[in-house]
Amino acid sequence: MFVGPHRCFLISLIVYTLTVTTSSARLILEDTTVRSEEDSGPSCPVLADEPVGEVMERICDMCHELSSHSRPNMRVECRADCFTTDAFRECLKLFTPRRHTRHLRQKY
């Protein structure tokens, strides 16, 4: 089918494509979040429960992405004191459905 330089070129192209695709996927899947010792240490029991801790971390990350232009330290503020700050509550409000918020207000 392909002989000589064409075959080498095709093999090189396939290897290059696989390498680029794999490295791009790795960049997307890797967690690039840097956690400070005070937020993720043993003093924060919330993070011991991995699914809950992961959701809380993600809320802070997404909130930071939305508000980093006005509050550049939002990620740190949100995670401070083991997610008990007003900044975390503000972020949580952003991602709480309106209907649920209305239900909570009526209930309490």
Curated annotation (Swiss-Prot):
A Gene Ontology biological process noted in the UniProt record is: ATF6-mediated unfolded protein response
The question of whether Cytoplasm is a record keyword is answered with: no
Gene3D superfamilies for this protein: Crustacean CHH/MIH/GIH neurohormone
Q: Does the keyword Disulfide bond apply?
A: yes
One GO molecular-function entry:
neuropeptide hormone activity
Which family does the record claim for this protein? Belongs to the arthropod CHH/MIH/GIH/VIH hormone family.
Q: What is this protein called?
A: Uncharacterized protein ZC168.2
